[in-house]
Amino acid sequence: IVGQISLGAIDLGSMRTGVIGYWVDQRYAGHGFAPMAVALLADWAFCDPTGPRLHRMEIALLPENERSRRVACKVGCHYEGVRPRYMFVNGQWRDHETYSLFAEDAGDGFIHRLIARHAMPESVQS
């Protein structure tokens, strides 16, 4: 197994929101699997007629988890701030940074933008 991605805490009421969670096996980390999975999930959840047609999704990550932060940034997430004592991790309540995606950000699709961005030479991306 390369990893896992999930969309949970879905609210189909007035908020139309969900929470993205993911992990990647250490052997496959850094190869682009997580950003690709998040982009595909976002396109499905926001735009696909078979998806829940959400308005907002969020990712919460530990402040020291630089790899997860890079995933959120590569996909185009918006940094929202730190949530104190947000999640119980390894026996203690830990602060988490929160990042969000919005349906209005989808444009031609998160996956399309991710592929296009990484297909361009790095000097052109800036």
Task: Identify the residue ranges that each predicted region occupies.
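Acyl-donor (CoA/ACP) binding surface of acyl/acetyltransferases
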Residues: I1-S126
